[in-house]
């Protein structure tokens, strides 16, 4: 089964907790703080594996979690950091944030890596909080939570050449003749339900990868038939061989079909019309094909949009014209840069950071309880060691520094009111 779109959940490892500990040795009465820091949690990394061709491995596994860092230890020893969780994906995988739809990365090169979730840093042990005013602090931090994100992985087949055309025009037959690929072939629509890849090797040592893009129909750009699933793969090719049936055995007019597919390309992505396109009239071994070809060529040359397109008629059965077509395709590929691909429209080329002056929290009164929410305050709370009073006092100072106390007073909170952050409930003190 060819799988080209999946949704997964990834969770990076949490940082290990720092600890409160003191040096206790004979003849060292004032050993001081000795609590070590926690180790860093593992990142979640996507890596291109040249041996993969589909996203099939994700069909039954959708959740991935990296290991957390180890807790700090006595004698100022830092906990062990965890290794990254590396997930293999095929080349041509586009990674999107499922919540925002933003493209996080485009993985095309063998061995290319992308960190999709960063592991949390280790919490600090009490030795980090020692100061002249507080030489023996009982303060430590829990590890920072690792990032968690829902992702959509979308595979776009990487090929130099794409075979384009209506169903049953002979794309699979051509692929089987010029390469060692063995696609399913039959005289009915949508025999090809997945992109098939093959390698074309010329006698002069040149080679290129060719993809049999499943047949398109009118309305494909709106998802009619199997349109969306197929059109995404066209974007990755550098040259399109547009196959047109010259057998005269169908009711459709060859030029009308040719024009319809170009209209679907335009609707799906106008930049696809700038892709180099070679017209390949097929089934030239059948009676009446020569007359159909003459009529078709005349219509093409009369349309200024297609007048400059090269035409290479072939027969995959008799092999007539195949050698010229393959050689010309290789020549055209040499004229087009390797990186001449359509960029994903919303892909970020640089990492940007947004700074906002708005509050990092919200406060809402629910059933006489002041509920505080916000990514920053919740993260600070998770990193607070609630088993030590000094750590709780430090968290209270952080809340005041963020303006939460002032906001509670402004909203009408009174002494003794219940305040909740996540599952932790405490009293508001004036």
From Swiss-Prot:
Query: Does this UniProt record's set of keywords contain Nucleotide-binding?
Result: yes
**Record-annotated membrane-spanning stretches:** none
Instruction: Give me the ranges of the annotated region Disordered.
Output: 122-143
Q: Which residues form the OCT domain?
A: 353-430
Cofactor(s) needed, names only, are:
Mg(2+)
Per the UniProt entry, the Enzyme Commission number(s) are: 3.6.5.-
* Origin superkingdom: Bacteria
Q: Could you tell me one molecular function GO term of this UniProt entry? A: GTPase activity
Task: Using the UniProt record, give the first listed, main subcellular location.
Answer: cytoplasm
Specify which residues bind GTP according to the UniProt entry for this protein.
Answer: 165-172, 190-194, 212-215, 282-285, 315-317
| One of the record's GO cellular component terms | cytoplasm
Question: Where does this protein hold Mg(2+)?
Answer: 172, 192
Cellular location of this protein?
Answer: Cytoplasm
At the top of the EC hierarchy, this enzyme's class is hydrolase
Instruction: Cite the entry's keywords alphabetically.
Output: Cytoplasm, GTP-binding, Hydrolase, Magnesium, Metal-binding, Nucleotide-binding
- Residue ranges constituting the OBG-type G domain according to the UniProt record: 159-334
Gene Ontology terms describing biological process = ribosome biogenesis
Q: Which residues form the Obg domain?
A: 1-158
* Self-association state and partner proteins as the record states: Monomer.
Report the protein's function: An essential GTPase which binds GTP, GDP and possibly (p)ppGpp with moderate affinity, with high nucleotide exchange rates and a fairly low GTP hydrolysis rate. Plays a role in control of the cell cycle, stress response, ribosome biogenesis and in those bacteria that undergo differentiation, in morphogenesis control.
User: Of which family is this protein a member?
Assistant: Belongs to the TRAFAC class OBG-HflX-like GTPase superfamily. OBG GTPase family.
Under which name does UniProt file this protein? GTPase Obg
* Protein's organism: Pediococcus pentosaceus (strain ATCC 25745 / CCUG 21536 / LMG 10740 / 183-1w)
